């Protein structure tokens, strides 16, 4: 063996490096830097990781906001998260500074394992993201919704009335079919005539699994401590296999829907009056080849997901609210009956004449947001806000639940009270760009990441609310003893866990308001079937 001569100076130097490194880890990693927004006390190395709940993080974040303010910081190992629970700060940072707050933080689970980075929700703020958004904006902008898409939306809402009439016990499935059929038809010319349609059932299964995987605590903090990639996943609930499985099923479903669309597009027996999104996108793709096949599949997938879940979950929460607050239901039906008779159901042309319906829609978004914590943003440069240093690379979490349950803005926030929005006569897109004091809710996101389907979604929900209230009375179901069955509307126990929140299945009594309205529903559904043929061929 060749002897190694190490000088005393080298030994001292190496020892000093080790000592300094250990001291750095102990006294710096996990600690909040001076000038950062305040937050809960930290521990060396891990920061606040040990304090993060595995479920219902938005409740804890709201509790901390009451103590530490509208913006506070959490230390996650070497990283920093900023939690915003203040509407004015949202406007200052997320809207007015959107050029530096529109990126996404690293996510090994959602970016690498599940979507390979091609899903618009997790995609970084780059040129590909801008190209995809441009296509979506052009197809779903307000003028297109007004001129073209609203006809289909009205027809699908009419079928939903028929479904509530015929099988009221399946009301939670009818709202899902309704919203999925609209977006699937507009994207692919493929309707969802029943909830049992394979593409719809498969999609909702995937979304439920993805939501569960993305719940904080369901996977190890691999973005903070990459060593978790190399520890046997069986110690953490096979998290890699679960996430990868969701990604494979996503890709398989979305690619198959593109393939089936191409087959139908080449079938001479199918003649559609209205072009779908993919008629336009694939025609452009033939010229430019600007997207990969995987990107194309996920361009469809992200819109299917967004268009299928939010509207359905909001309509389900609306039904809950009508059962539990019958006075709200009574006031809404009185407004409808003053404007519309029994010989027709409400249409989008009635929007201005039914402001209370708009208020109900806004209050439902506020009362039970589908995403109580919006998908995280990432700060791309240092920024100063109200005297605080917000560091480059920080993860930004918008605490939608906390903002929309702020008692200083919404007294008795657990009460469903549409009168909060009696002066809000416009739709959500108008308030998203207005003064922060007028913002109605944050269901569609903020800044440059605001949902590109916002105009479609607003019309989905408004039509659903208006037609269902015109047609039906919603009451508590009764048990075998003849007593009303109380509904669990507790956001902690009556709703699903995960990134997306929806009411757990519940029973209620749905009764058509008159025989004349029943006949009108049947008559309007016959007309709706003609509309479906125009979109599907």
Swiss-Prot record:
One GO molecular-function entry: heme binding
Record's subcellular location: Membrane
Keywords attached to this entry: Glycoprotein, Heme, Iron, Membrane, Metal-binding, Monooxygenase, Oxidoreductase, Transmembrane, Transmembrane helix
Effect of a null allele: Abolishes the production of arthrobotrisins A to D and arthrosporol A, and accumulates m-cresol. Lead to altered growth rates and causes significant decreases in the spore formation and germination. Shows significantly increased ammonia levels in fungal mycelia.
Family annotation (Pfam families): p450
UniProt: heme binding residues: 451
The name this protein goes by in its record: Cytochrome P450 monooxygenase AOL_s00215g282
């Amino acid at each position: 063996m060749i002897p190694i001569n190490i000088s005393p100076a080298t030994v001292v130097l190496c020892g000093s490096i080790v000592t300094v490194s250990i001291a750095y880890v102990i006294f710096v990693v996990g600690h909040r830097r001076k000038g950062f927004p305040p937050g809960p006390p930290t521990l060396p190395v891990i920061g606040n990781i040990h304090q993060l709940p595995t479920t219902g993080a938005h409740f804890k974040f709201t509790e901390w906001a009451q103590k530490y303010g509208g913006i506070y910081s959490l230390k996650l190992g070497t990283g920093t998260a900023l939690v915003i629970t203040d509407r004015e700060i949202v406007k200052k940072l997320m809207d007015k500074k959107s050029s530096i707050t529109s990126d996404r933080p690293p996510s090994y689970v959602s970016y690498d394992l599940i979507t390979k980075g091609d899903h618009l929700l997790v995609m970084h703020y780059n040129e590909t993201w801008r190209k995809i958004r441009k296509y979506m904006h052009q197809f779903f902008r307000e003028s297109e919704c007004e001129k073209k898409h609203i006809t289909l939306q009205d027809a699908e809402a009419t079928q939903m009335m028929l479904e509530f009439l015929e099988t009221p016990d399946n009301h939670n499935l009818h709202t899902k079919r309704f919203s999925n059929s609209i977006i699937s038809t507009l994207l692919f010319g493929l309707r969802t005539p029943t909830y049992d349609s394979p593409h719809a059932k498969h999609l909702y299964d995937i979304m439920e699994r993805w939501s569960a995987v993305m719940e904080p605590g369901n996977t190890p903090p691999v973005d903070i401590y990459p060593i978790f990639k190399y520890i046997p996943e069986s110690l953490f609930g096979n998290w890699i296999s679960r996430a990868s499985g969701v990604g494979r099923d996503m890709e398989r479903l979305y690619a198959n829907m593109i393939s089936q669309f191409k087959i139908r597009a080449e079938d001479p027996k199918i003649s559609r009056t209205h072009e779908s999104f993919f008629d336009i996108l694939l025609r452009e793709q033939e010229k430019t080849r600007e997207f990969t096949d995987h990107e194309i599949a996920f361009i469809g997938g992200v819109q299917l997901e967004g268009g299928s879940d939010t509207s359905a979950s909001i309509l389900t929460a609306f039904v809950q609210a009508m059962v539990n607050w019958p006075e709200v239901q009574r006031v809404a039906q009185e407004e409808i009956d003053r404007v519309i008779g029994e010989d027709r159901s409400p249409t989008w042309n009635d929007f201005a004449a039914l402001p209370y319906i708009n208020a109900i829609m806004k209050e439902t978004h506020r009362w039970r947001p589908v995403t109580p914590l919006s998908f995280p943003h990432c700060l791309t440069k240092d920024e100063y806000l109200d005297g605080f240093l917000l560091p480059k690379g920080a993860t930004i979490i918008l605490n939608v639940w906390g903002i929309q349950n702020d008692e200083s803005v919404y007294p008795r926030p657990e009460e469903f009270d549409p009168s909060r929005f009696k002066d809000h006569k416009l739709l959500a897109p108008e308030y998203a760009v207005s003064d922060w004091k007028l913002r109605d809710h944050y269901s569609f996101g903020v800044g440059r990441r605001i949902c590109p389907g916002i105009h479609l979604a607003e019309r989905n929900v408004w039509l659903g609310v208006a037609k269902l209230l015109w047609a039906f009375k919603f009451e508590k179901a009764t048990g075998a003893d003849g007593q009303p069955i109380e509904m669990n509307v507790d956001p902690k126990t009556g709703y699903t866990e995960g990134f997306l929140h929806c009411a757990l299945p519940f029973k209620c009594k749905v009764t058509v308001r008159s025989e004349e309205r029943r006949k009108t529903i049947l008559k309007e559904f016959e007309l709706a079937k003609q509309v479906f043929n125009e979109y599907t061929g």
